[in-house]
């Protein structure tokens, strides 16, 4: 598995391409469709994963769907996204082509926030960042739900790589040790 990242938009959101052979998944197409398409190249996109519906994570979604007619995976609890191929994810495993992934509900930053667990990698959106966590003071945010989500991921292996919605990649073990919000 190969993971590529492009930073997009004025909020510097991380959009990811997860590749297996020539197949790929896109995570959080936030903005700047040209940068995203350049990262994709000739990869055959088979799905789009959305961690939550803030504008900086879905800003290029409509443009991307004009190029790729693929399913969108998202926890549509607030009924904010309305697409024909929307898969309203549950907390379970999914298989798309060559990809097997697990969805974890990780509300706190927003009530629609999910983490995608693929291989030894977590795509956390704005749930966990390197040495920080997502804000809980915005619409649909909750301190209590954030703490429940943090406790949920503590059971996973320390060597899991975290790919956040903003900033640098990190490891779960490092965050559990050094991130004061996870103590």
What are these regions (language model features)?
Residues 1-43, 114-125:
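Conserved beta-strand hairpin/beta-sheet module of binuclear metal-dependent hydrolase folds
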Residues 8-13, 17, 21, 76, ...:
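Active-site-proximal loop/helix segment associated with metal-binding centers of metalloenzymes
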Residues 24, 31-100, 181:
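Active-site HxH/HxHxD metal-binding segment of metal-dependent hydrolases
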Residues 24, 111-183:
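Metallo-beta-lactamase
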Residues 48-58, 105-113, 163-169:
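Histidine-centered catalytic micro-motifs
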Residues 78, 82-85, 105, 113, ...:
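Active-site-adjacent C-terminal substructures of enzyme catalytic domains
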Residues 92-93, 99-115:
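Pocket-forming structural segment of enzyme catalytic cores
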């Amino acid at each position: 598995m190969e993971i590529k990242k492009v930073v997009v938009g004025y909020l510097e959101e991380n959009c990811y391409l997860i590749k297996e052979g020539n197949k790929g998944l896109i995570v959080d197409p936030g903005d700047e469709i040209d940068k995203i398409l350049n990262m994709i190249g000739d990869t055959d996109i088979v799905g789009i994963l959305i961690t939550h519906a803030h504008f900086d994570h879905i800003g290029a979604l409509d443009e991307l769907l004009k190029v790729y007619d693929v399913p969108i995976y998202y926890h549509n609890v607030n009924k904010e996204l309305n697409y024909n191929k929307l898969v309203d994810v549950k907390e379970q495993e999914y298989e798309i082509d060559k990809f097997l992934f697990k969805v974890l509900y990780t509300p706190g930053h927003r009530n629609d926030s999910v983490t995608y667990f693929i291989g030894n990698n977590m795509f956390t959106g704005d749930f966990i960042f390197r040495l920080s966590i997502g804000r809980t003071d915005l619409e649909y945010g909750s301190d209590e739900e954030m703490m429940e989500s943090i406790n949920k991921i503590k059971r996973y292996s320390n060597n899991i790589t975290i790919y956040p919605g903003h900033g640098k990649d990190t490891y779960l073990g490092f965050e559990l040790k050094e991130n004061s919000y996870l103590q």
